[in-house]
C-alpha cells in the first residue's frame, strides 16, 4: 500500500470521529484547545489500536466482524445520540454553567470505540494487504486526533451560536452516523 493510499485511508477512517467530536464540542462549555487535544488524543489512540486488533484477528474472524460491526457501532451511537438529545431537551435552564467543561474519559472512550468499529474491520482487511500495520495505524491515529481536535473546536463555535440545541444536534449527528454505518453494511449485503 503506497503512502498516499495510507493517508487517504487514515482520513477516511477519521470522518465518523470528526462528526462525533463536533457534537461533543457543542455540548461543552467553551472547550479550550487543550481539552480538544485531550479528546483528540483519546479518539486517536482508540482509532489507532482498533485496526491493529483487527489485523491480529485476521481472516479467521472476518465473517463475525463483517456480520456484527455495524450493529455494534449503530447501537452504541444510537444510545449516545439519544442520551445527548435527552440532555438537550430536558426542562431546565439553558444556562451555560450547566454544560460540562470537559467530558469524562469513559464517555469519550465509548464514543471513540463506537466510531472506530469500522477500523477494526479495516484492520482485518489490512492483514491480507502488503502494508506495515504500524505505519497505517499511526497514520489513522494521527489523522483522527487532528480531525477530532478540529471537530471539537468547530463544535465549540456551533455550540456558542446554538446554545443547548447544539447538544440535540450532536445527538442527531451521532444517530445519523450510526444509521449510515448500518445502512452501508446492510445495503452491501443485499
Curated annotation (Swiss-Prot):
GO cellular component: plasma membrane
UniProt GO molecular function: manganese ion transmembrane transporter activity
TM segment ranges: 3-23, 39-59, 65-85, 106-128, 133-155, 157-177
UniProt key word Protease: no
Chief location: membrane
Membrane topology listed for this record: Multi-pass membrane protein
Localization of this protein: Cell inner membrane
Role, per record: Probably functions as a manganese efflux pump.
Name of this chain's protein: Putative manganese efflux pump MntP
Record organism: Pseudomonas fluorescens (strain ATCC BAA-477 / NRRL B-23932 / Pf-5)
Taxon lineage: Bacteria, Pseudomonadati, Pseudomonadota, Gammaproteobacteria, Pseudomonadales
